[in-house]
Amino acid sequence: MAADDKKIIFSMVGVSKAFQPNKNVLKDIYLSFFYGAKIGIIGLNGSGKSTLLKIIAGLEKSYQGEVVFSPGYSVGYLAQEPYLDNTKTVKEVVMEGVQPIVDALTEYEEINQKFALPEYYEDQDKMDALFTRQGELQDIIDATDAWNLDSKLERAMDALRCPPEDQPVANLSGGERRRVALCRLLLQKPDILLLDEPTNHLDAESIDWLEQHLQQYEGTVIAVTHDRYFLDHVAGWILELDRGEGIPWKGNYSSWLEQKTKRMEMEEKTASKRRKTLERELEWVRMAPKARQAMGKARLNSYDKLLNEDVKEKEEKLEIFIPNGPRLGNKVIEAKHVAKAYGDKLLFDDLNFMLPPNGIVGVIGPNGAGKTTLFRLIMGLESVDKGEFEVGETVKVAYVDQQHKDIDPNKSVYQVISGGNELLRMGGRDVNARAYLSRFNFSGADQEKLCGVLSGGERNRLHLAMALKEEGNVLLLDEPTNDIDVNTLRALEEGLEDFAGCAVVISHDRWFLDRICTHILAFEGDSNVFYFEGSYSEYEENKLKRLGNEEPKRVRYRKLMTD
């Protein structure tokens, strides 16, 4: 359908949704969407973002108010846990997105075969009907570039790093299923594209490709995401969900940040912690690139200053306060000629790096490249095939993994954190356990939830809270930014900036990486790992000079060569 920026294609009139009596998740929302608009939805976890998408998609029927669609528009929806047919292969599922094109090609070939049959070529009326239908199909095929369908599918699957096309869907991980579902949906090209956390399980290169694709997308895009660069590059509107209300803001994320800060200044007599955090993020946004680079270099030389900062002052300033742990010596962790393979798949070979005492190292690269394996090797949970990791004598590691296996599902959030003690000893001071949990967005009621019923984002926040209270001086954080709302991300960034120690963070969140990292350890494909001193943006510039501007490809491995 042709773009029409004056055409309202969808409206919500007085929409409210409550999961419990007197507890509205969405409250009396009035919204209208124009064709071609790009809208990013933000808000705390539990604020109703996914529920709003489900209402628009027609999957959530139990609500008050009215939802009105203009006739003739199609809707496509990417759920956080999409349904895929387990009896099919990856390619068969992806091809569902182009089924009308496949049907047109199939019918075109059938018509060509009919031309050779006597019952058709001996009957002029039937031949005329075939020629007419063939012309109609030819128009469809030409308009959709259907003759190049296989190469288009291959490019899309490569760009999103989908698994091999012949792999059974039943064998895919959760992240692989999402990438396949996203690929199918983008090929489908609905008029309204509803995306629930589209950047989850995508690496930075695939996210960059997705951004460019959506910037050029003719239809309306409505995305729930915590990826602030995605919101900056794609969104023309921000819809903030706050205590049930839907507040629209014109502009991208940086524009929202500026408008939101001004509004909070007018509403608050004294500046809250959250407002100060927003103001500091806005200050970073306004910085010139060279000033940002200088900040990263200054951090590397400020270990003693950070270590000696007054704990009480830091705790009062920060929403998430990370205790420093014991003083680090000059030797932190050093990789010496490390190699690791699974079977004949070489993850990395001759890996060398030295972690700085006050550095924040961002670990980036495609899923399956070996990032989590690196952490498991450092922790001694797996063995290297060659080389060694040397760990300094003063190092005390706090490790946050993706599996969260050490969370007891039968205990409440409060019980897991407190261990039965009302006060936690952190940074040489007593900290109230409930107050500590509230910093990770666990309110009073949420603190009593059993861990077995927590969402992915809640488990991530809980595990982060568990690890950060251990007072390590080296933090290994595996995807701490997954399923975490923007407010918690912002608070975590500030906590890490003020942490006197070394942090190594696996993340695909480019804004997060850009704001806090002093170094980047990049898994670049073909078993190559590149260690770079500088911010994420500086690394990207360096990579462009070294490797050129290529579209993302699926992960490929070299074979392990034995002596």
For each predicted feature, which ranges?
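ABC ATP-binding cassette signature C-motif
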Residues: M1-S272, E316, P323-D563
